[in-house]
Amino acid sequence: MFVAREWFRHRVGSFNEFSMRYAKASDEFYIPAPEDVRSQVGKPGAYSFEPVEPELAEQTREELQAVYDAAYETYNRLVEQGVARELARLVMPMGAYTEFYWTVNARSLMNFVSLRAAETAQREIRRYAEACERFLGEKMPVTHSAFVDNGRVAP
């Protein structure tokens, strides 16, 4: 969910997200790879990320898993007790995976890619932006070529 929330901030195109209000929540959650657990150094807007010690990375991963397990167990218990899904979903953590459809024009897609595939973008959303760029290159090769030739800046 945390990547989707960053994505939705672009306010371009239209989004249709899977709703835990009407369907059972998934039991899939984001656990970063050990090398993706990092510390933030510096001030907001002007910071960098540094790797953490392997022990801290593993501890972080274990704690995330424990929180996810507890939250999903609570969610299921509430639903089984008759609590409406729209209320039970409130216990779901930001690391829960979500699904959505995105309808977007080429110009807005290029803008998204130029911002979110940059080295300064959050690593997790950068991976999705890179996938969007591959899609752009496959479906609109001439447009993608012009995008790259123009310094990866949307017109």
Residue ranges and their predicted role:
Residues 1-155:
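Family-specific signature for flavin-dependent thymidylate synthase
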